[in-house]
Amino acid sequence: MKRSNSIAVMLVLVLSSLMLLLPVEGQGHEGHGVGEILLMGKLGAPVCGVRASGRVCPDGYCCSQWGYCGTTEEYCGKGCQSQCDYNRCGKEFGGKECHDELCCSQYGWCGNSDGHCGEGCQSQCSYWRCGKDFGGRLCTEDMCCSQYGWCGLTDDHCEDGCQSQCDLPTLLPSPLRRIIAIRKLKANLANMLS
């Protein structure tokens, strides 16, 4: 009898844990269910603001309307609760430059996409750029320079038309390059959080 009770209790615990990960329409952060939010709070973005008794984010992070810390427009834009100008830059923000070598877009947001570093970029516009159109500039951190002059580790950067630093990453299979890129991003994020 004790054994069947133990199994039943264990089954209930396992099933209830799985149910926490099911998305709940209209609840949580960006369509995530409550269980996902709890997981994100533990493994991902720290909680902040009203839902966390007024706790603020680590330096450099905005507290979103949902009560999570981050650096993108989703966190620092509409509904942001505190530290909302971290990922902002440019003339409308007193000439503030972006952190971590990111480009300042024409709209005053920090990032490294073509929308940030391309036409209209306000400052630090060439960090993610490379190649013949940028004075032969090489990429940092062992990244390839794509045919279009962007630094990265994807097939688009390291294969057809790659301008420089193409050899080492192309010796690695594509999934491994993605893993390396993800690890570098995680390391950068960990450095920002510490």
From Swiss-Prot:
N-acetyl-D-glucosamine binding lectin. Almost no hemagglutinating activity towards human erythrocytes. Low mitogenic activity towards human peripheral blood lymphocytes. Keywords: Chitin-binding, Disulfide bond, Lectin, Mitogen, Repeat, Signal. Coiled coil: none annotated. Residues 1-26 form the signal peptide. Residues 27-44, 171-194 form a propeptide. GO terms for molecular function: carbohydrate binding; chitin binding. SMART domains: ChtBD1. Disulfide bonds join C48-C63, C57-C69, C62-C76, C80-C84, C89-C104, C98-C110, C103-C117, C121-C125, C130-C145, C139-C151, C144-C158, C162-C166. Residues 45-86, 87-127, 128-168 form the Chitin-binding type-1 domain. This is Lectin-C. InterPro entries: Chitin-bd_1, Chitin-binding_1_CS, Endochitinase-like_sf. GO terms for biological process: positive regulation of cell division; positive regulation of mitotic nuclear division.
